[in-house]
Amino acid sequence: MNAPEKLRQHDRAARAVGNIVHLEHFNVVIGDQRLATLFYVVGLGGTRDPYLFMGLENMWVNFGRTQVHLPSRGTQPRPEVLRGTAGFVVPNLDDLVRRLEHAGTEMKRIAPELPNNFAFQRKGDSVEATCPWGNRVRCHAPAPEFGRTELGLAYVDFDVPPGTADGIARFYNEVMRAPASAAQGRATVGIGRDQRLHFTESAAPQPAYDNHHIQIYIADFSAPYEWLKSHDLISMETDADEWRFQWIVDPRDGRKLFQIEHETRSMKHRLFGRPLVNRNHALTNMTYVPGADAFRGTF
C-alpha cells in the first residue's frame, strides 16, 4: 500500500540528472601505441576494446561504461594534451601503484629512445599520473561522491582563464540545460548519475588548443543545437545523431570563455549504451580462475 501523501517528503529535484546523460570518452592523439598500451591498459587497468579499431591507426580503451580514444594519425602524429586533468575511479589504489611501477619499467625497456613524460605519485587518497605525452590523470578509489562506480571516467577538470567560471556555469545551465554552479573560481557541471565536468580558474599560461575533445550524450538533442547554430557555434555536422561545437560562451554577452570540442550525440546514436568489455586486470596466467575473466565490480 502506498504511504499517505502527507508522509512523503522527498526532494525530487535532487534526483534529476539534467540534459547531459553521459560523459563517454575523451579523445587525444598519441605518438606510439606501445607506450599508450603500457599507460592506459597495463598501468591504469583499462581494457582495449576487442571489437573496434584493432589496428594501428586508433585504439579505444574501456573503463567501465566509459572510454579513452587514442588515435595515432599519420606516420608522425602530433600528440594532443588535455588542458586539465582526467579523473578516474579504479577499484584499488595499491594495485594501481604496482601496475604503474611495472608500466614505467616496461616503457624504459621497450622505447628508451622516445621522449616520455610518464610519472606518478600517490597523494593521500588519490594517485596522480602523467601519460607519456603529458596528459594528467587523477585516480580515486570508489567513494560516495562517485556513486556506485568502481571503474570509470568520473570527471574532467579543465584549467580555464580567470574570470570565466560564472559564465561557464551559465552556459551549461542555459544552453546545454545541465545543472551547473560556480563558486570560488570553479564551475561544476552535473552529468548523468554521478559524472561531472569541472572548470577551475588558473592564472597559469594556457597552451594553445590542439583539437582534443570530449564526447557527451544529451537527452534534448535539438534545443542546445538550435541555440548554438543561431550563434554560429556549430563546428561540425556529423550526421543525424551527432554534431560538435568547440567554444563555451557566456550566454549573457556571447564572450568566448574556453575552447574544448564537445562531440555531442543523441540517445538514439548507434553507439549509445553499447556494452563495453572490461577485463579482470588482477588475473594472470598464474592466478587464473575459470569464469573470472571479466571485471565483476560495478560501473
Language model region names:
Residues 1-19, 21-31, 49-50, 59-66, 73-158, ...:
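Vicinal oxygen chelate
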Residues 1-65, 75:
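Hydrophobic, helix-prone linear segments
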Residues 36-43, 100, 134, 168-173, ...:
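Conserved active-site tyrosine of GNAT-family acetyltransferases
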Residues 44, 176, 232:
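Glycine-centered, phosphate/nucleic-acid-interacting loop/turn motifs that mediate DNA/RNA or nucleotide
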Residues 70-72, 198-201:
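Active-site-proximal beta-strand elements of phosphoester/diester hydrolases
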Residues 162-170, 176-181:
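Solenoidal tandem-repeat scaffolds enriched in leucines and small polar residues
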